Structure formats: structure tokens, C-alpha cells
Design a protein with these regions (language model features):
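C-terminal hydrophobic helical "lid"/dimerization subdomain
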Residues: 281-330
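Short, glycine/polar-rich helix-capping loops at beta-to-alpha or helix-loop-helix junctions
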Residues: 101, 182-189, 251-257
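Glycine-rich NAD(P) Rossmann-fold beta1-alpha1 loop
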Residues: 131, 157-164, 225
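NAD(P)H dinucleotide-binding glycine-rich loop of Rossmann-like/cofactor-binding domains
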Residues: 89-154
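Residue-level marker of beta-strand positions
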Residues: 32, 84-85, 104, 152, ...
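Adenosine-nucleotide cofactor-binding segment
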Residues: 171-227, 285
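Glycine-rich phosphate-binding loop and adjacent beta-alpha segment
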Residues: 227-293, 328-329
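Glycine-rich beta-strand-centered segment in the early N-terminal region that forms part
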Residues: 26-42, 53-93
């Protein structure tokens, strides 16, 4: 039997989640690799799926969980064999396909990455899509020319999963990190992660209305979007760029073209869903090499499947700090 957290939709369109045992025959056949899932995690997108928001889930009943890691049970694909430790994220797993909140899953070989040496399944889910996206953003910004001597790098929404990991990784690479948060009580936490100073959300929302401001940021990892992203664009230095990856502060913004014309700034869209396998492997290897395990452990908390629904709401309410690891067998 397979233990799974299943979300159902009622006749009035409300959704509810419950833990059930299902037969292996009830698991959708989404690919040639069968995985015994050990760990998953909780991201903002998981919170949306658990609560029937964002039009992400197409059909019910549904198993959310956009991340998973475990051991291959069987494989009909070249290059992946029974016993391999693997992780899977992206490609709409947990959204339009059943995801990681179950003890079994399957997927196509091109969605699955064998874990680098020294990275356990639990370690990988302390990172999950959040850590993956943080490293992806840094590599993209550096490919665009960002360097540690090019000025401070702003991380917005720094208390969340992506922001927390990005703060650690940037500081480890020698950047001066300004961490923006709306929660003053986590300032010490962000400083411990490597932030050189704290910027309040209110400060970033206090927009003077000018089309362009003094150049402050050599780069930015923006996890929130909305008018905060518009403000960041005004404050980028010449040739600076912002990696845009979230919309918790809004999906639209009112921005001027002046910084693009006079400073040559860039907005780099970060799509972690459809990254090709070679690049996915590169990102996971970089995470294994650079993210300190002790720091990651300190910023992570483990829960069981029975707590996932509650934490899905908490992450939407901005009440989750750092990373949440889900032990699907717990």
C-alpha cells in the first residue's frame, strides 16, 4: 500500500486534504522510473496547491508536492537503475501530475537527477526547489556579469526558502548581501545567514515616484515581485540585473523604461520548471559543493505528512522561516 496526502474538491469547489492508503494500481503512470519517496518539502506553490489556489491543479483527487527525493525501485530508462538515489522537481510535478506527498511516485528520466556524491535524500529536500531556484538565479546573474565587487546584492523576501538559501550562497561567494524582509523579528536570523544589513519591506515600498533613483544594487534576487520589483529596477547600478522569480507581493508592476535606457539594466526571468537535465545536474552539483550542511540544518525543520496541510497555509500567510522538510514516512 502507498501512503499519500490526497487533496479532494467538493461540489462547492472547496478543497480538503487527508492522508490515505491507496493501491499501487491507483498511482498514475507518468514515466518509466518508479521511486520509493523518502522526503519532500513545502514551497509557496505547494501552499497554493494544497488550498486549491492559483489554478495550478487541473484534476482531483490530487497528490501535491513539487519536490521529492528517494530511491529508485525500478527503471525502464537508460542511465537510471534500481538503487539510485534521485531527486525530482519541476515539469509540473505536484501540479498537473501527482507529486511528492506520497511514499511512491514515478516520472520520466529527463525529469530526474541522480543525487551528487555526499548529498542524501534528506539533504536534497532541505534545499528542494527553493535551493535549486536560488542557485539557478545566482548562476544566471553571474552569467550576466554580476561580480562581488560590483556592489551590494539585494535579496527580497529573504526570510523565505529561496531568500534564505540565496543569502547564504551569495555571502559564501563573497557578495555583500542586503536582506529585505517584512518581519523585523528575523533580522538576527538573516544576519546569521550572512546578510551584511537588513532592509525593511516598508523602506522598499516607500517609493518617491521618480523614474530612476541612485544606483545602489549591483544585482538582486527578487522573490516577491509587484511594486518592490519596480523599485529595485530604479535602484540598479549601471548594467545591473534582477533575477525575478516570485510574485507574493503582486503579479503586476508599474515601472519606467528609463533605467533600461540610461543604465542598461536587465530583468532576468527565472523558470525552474523546465530547466534541461544537464543544467539541472549542474545546479544540484553546485548546491552540494557550496551550501554548508550545518547552516542548512539550522535553517530547516522536519515534519510528517500529517502536518503538511497546516504548513501549507502557514507558508501562504508568511509564517514560515527557512526550509520545511517533509518525511513522507513519518
Amino acid at each position: 500500500m502507498i501512503k499519500a496526502l490526497i487533496v479532494d474538491q467538493a461540489d462547492d469547489d472547496s478543497v480538503s486534504a487527508s492522508i490515505r492508503e491507496i493501491e499501487a494500481s491507483q498511482l498514475p503512470d507518468d514515466g518509466e522510473v518508479d521511486i520509493a519517496v523518502e522526503y519532500s518539502t513545502i514551497n509557496y506553490k505547494d501552499g497554493l496547491c494544497l488550498n486549491g489556489l492559483g489554478r495550478l491543479v487541473r484534476n482531483y483527487p490530487h497528490v501535491p508536492g513539487i519536490d521529492l527525493a528517494g530511491t529508485v525501485i525500478s527503471s525502464r530508462a537508460d542511465g537510471i537503475a534500481a538503487g539510485d538515489r534521485v531527486t525530482m522537481n519541476g515539469f509540473r510535478s505536484g501540479e498537473i501530475r501527482w507529486g511528492g506527498y506520497a511514499t511512491r511516485a514515478n516520472g520520466k528520466a529527463e525529469w530526474i537527477v541522480k543525487l551528487p556524491d555526499g548529498m542524501s535524500t534528506r539533504h536534497s529536500q532541505m534545499l528542494g526547489t527553493a535551493g535549486f531556484t536560488a542557485m539557478q538565479s545566482i548562476l544566471r546573474l553571474e552569467a550576466n556579469g554580476m561580480t562581488p565587487d560590483g556592489g551590494e546584492v539585494l535579496v527580497t523576501g529573504a526570510g523565505g526558502g529561496v531568500g534564505s538559501v540565496a543569502t547564504v550562497l551569495l555571502a559564501k561567494r563573497g557578495y555583500q548581501v542586503a536582506a529585505m524582509t517584512g518581519r523585523a523579528e528575523i533580522a538576527d536570523y538573516l544576519t546569521d545567514l550572512g546578510a551584511s544589513r537588513i532592509v525593511s519591506r516598508e523602506e522598499m515600498l516607500d517609493d518617491p515616484g521618480k523614474p530612476m533613483e541612485s544606483g545602489v544594487w549591483g544585482g538582486c534576487i527578487d522573490c516577491v515581485g509587484g511594486q518592490i520589483l519596480a523599485r529595485v529596477i530604479k535602484q540598479l547600478r549601471n548594467g545591473g540585473a534582477v533575477a525575478s522569480l516570485g510574485n507574493t507581493a503582486g503579479a503586476t508592476m508599474n515601472a519606467s523604461v528609463i533605467p533600461f535606457l540610461l543604465r542598461g539594466v536587465s530583468v532576468l526571468g527565472i523558470d525552474s520548471v523546465t530547466v534541461p537535465l544537464p543544467q539541472r545536474s549542474e545546479i544540484w552539483t553546485a548546491l552540494a559543493n557550496e551550501m554548508p550542511k550545518d547552516v542548512l540544518a539550522d535553517m530547516s525543520r522536519e515534519i510528517g505528512l500529517g502536518e503538511v496541510a497546516d504548513y501549507g497555509q502557514k507558508i501562504l500567510d508568511g509564517q514560515v522561516r527557512g526550509r520545511i522538510v517533509v518525511n513522507v514516512n513519518g
